[in-house]
From Swiss-Prot:
Organism expressing this protein natively: Leptospira interrogans serogroup Icterohaemorrhagiae serovar copenhageni (strain Fiocruz L1-130)
Annotated EC: 6.1.1.6
Cofactor(s) named in the record: Mg(2+)
Protein known as: Lysine--tRNA ligase
Binding site residues for Mg(2+) 1: 406, 413
Record GO terms (molecular function): ATP binding; lysine-tRNA ligase activity; magnesium ion binding; tRNA binding
Length: 495
């Protein structure tokens, strides 16, 4: 029997022993009235005596049994506090229970505070109760020379068993607490800007709003094929048509694509649409929102991301899509007239463009490989090719291009925005072009959406739209270097 299995058997045996004593190892309820951090801070300012009792609940973090007295530490979701328990205070039965506790056990305690001779605030335990047994031993975390070592260092295992990861790694829990604050702050900011939060379908008869492969499902009663949404965009713009002038949705999207440090098939997106807005109003909104979040969450506009100090102070740099590709690859795609020439130049840079069917698809691969990783400081990339932007309004001053921008920071895209195309005739032509690309083998090309065309035929005001990837934004604001570090339960291969 392995050491781990032997420990599990020992802990199960302890449960059986408690049952024989008539003690329920999984009692129905226990109501703490305090948090360890709160009572310690208050005690430091205003010490209390044995007459002031506190009830705490949490996990046993450490334990030292010394005959008739024991020291231990309790960890709750606010912090860690030292415990002092004696046989005289607890009595034979409860002290026996206390001594038999294992690290990780969830316990309920009552007691009063005092300071040890070393000055550590400690809970003098007067009552103890096992609330839930930790049957499986927790990984042991150790620190040496500022580096943390534990038996849970395998990243894949941490993602797969996030519940254990959260128990043993405080920084992981802190990341997800920060994520929650970011999401709440986004909602608050947009609400103050006059946006109304709405919900649109997760299952859609047509996968639209983005260039991506969808997940396919089937509705049995209606006998119809449905897609998990790849984006909410076309439904949100239907609401603009309906007179809801400022709307946003913060929810999940699903794309049947690869997994990487920047991609997870299930991810969170915020999309906002503003009637009588355009690319410039959404650019201003993006800059204000992200700088607001940085100041609110990080307390500064200069944040450390890996080895880079990123300065989010406005105004952010701006440059065009064509110019940024030329800067980092030497290729001016605006001057290339044949697909063969585009592929040749890309291949010389060792960029795989074998599946690209158009010049601008080649350009986009070159951008992703050569330019994007270098965009560390915040920058808005503007003036995208019309071909790559089937839902964006054409730029009247630059034929072949659209009023679109994408914000980049820390070497990755964190959003996408444009002046929305509201001409139903132009939109139908672009959908038709996308259908041709789809028929030619591009399974990420858009599908035709006749109902959306019909909605535009009722008239949509000039509109600005914005999408921001929440997971990537959280990566930036928490100094996380994989998207899976910002998603509680990322998709994993089967064990």
């Amino acid at each position: 029997m392995s050491e781990s299995n032997e420990l599990i058997e020992q802990r199960i045996q302890k449960i059986e022993e408690l049952k024989k004593q008539g003690i329920n190892p999984y009692p129905v309820r226990f109501f703490p009235d305090s948090k360890s951090k709160d009572i310690a801070e208050k005690f430091e300012k205003n010490p209390t005596g044995p007459e002031t009792k506190f009830k705490l609940g949490g996990r046993l973090h450490s334990k030292r049994v010394m005959g008739k007295a024991s020291f231990a530490h309790l960890k709750d979701n606010s912090g860690i506090i030292q415990l002092y328990a004696t046989k005289d205070d607890l009595g034979e039965t409860q002290y026996s229970i206390f001594k038999s506790l294992d690290l990780g056990d969830i316990i309920g305690l009552e007691g009063y505070l005092f300071k040890t001779q070393k000055g550590e605030i400690t809970l003098h335990v007067t009552s103890v109760e096992l609330l839930s047994k930790c049957i499986r031993p927790l990984p042991v975390v150790k620190e040496k020379d500022g580096v943390v070592y534990d038996a849970f260092a395998d990243v894949e295992q941490r993602y797969r068993m996030r519940y254990v990861d959260l128990i043993v790694n405080d920084h992981v829990r802190d990341t997800f607490i920060t994520r929650s604050k970011i999401v709440s702050e986004i909602r608050s900011f947009l609400t103050q800007e006059g946006f109304l939060e709405v919900e649109t379908p997760m299952m859609q008869p047509i996968a639209g709003g983005a260039a991506a492969r969808p997940f396919v499902t089937h509705h049995n009663t209606l006998d119809m094929q449905l897609f998990l949404r790849i984006a909410p965009e076309l439904y949100l713009k239907r609401l603009i048509v309906g007179g809801m002038d400022r709307v946003f949705e913060l929810n999940r999207n699903f794309r049947n694509e690869g997994i990487s440090t920047k991609h997870n098939p299930e991810f969170t997106m915020m999309e906002a649409y503003m009637a009588f807005g355009d690319m410039s109003t959404m650019l201003d909104l993006t800059e204000r929102l992200i700088t607001h979040l940085a100041q609110k969450i990080c307390g500064t506009l200069k944040i450390q991301y890996g080895k880079d100090l990123i300065d989010l102070s406005p105004p952010w740099k701006r440059t065009t899509y064509v110019d940024i590709i030329k800067e980092y690859s030497g290729i001016d795609f605006s001057q290339i007239i044949s697909l063969e020439e585009a592929k040749k130049k890309a291949s010389e840079l060792k960029v795989d463009v074998s599946k690209c069917q158009t010049i601008w698809k080649v350009a986009d691969e070159v951008f992703s490989e050569k330019a994007e990783p270098n965009l560390i400081q915040p920058i808005f990339i503007t003036d995208y090719p019309k071909e790559l932007s089937p839902l964006a309004k054409s730029n009247p001053d630059k034929p072949g291009y659209v009023e679109r921008f994408e914000p980049y920071v820390a070497g990755r895209e964190i959003g996408n925005a444009f002046t929305e195309l509201n001409d139903p005739f132009d939109q139908k032509e672009r959908f038709e072009d996308q259908v041709k690309q789809r028929e030619a083998g591009d399974d990420e090309a858009f599908m035709m959406d006749e109902d959306y065309i019909r909605a535009l035929e009722y008239g949509m005001p000039p509109t600005g739209g914005l999408g921001i990837g929440i997971d990537r934004l959280v990566m930036l604001l928490t100094n996380s270097h994989s998207i899976r570090d910002t998603i509680l339960f990322p998709l994993m291969r089967p064990e």
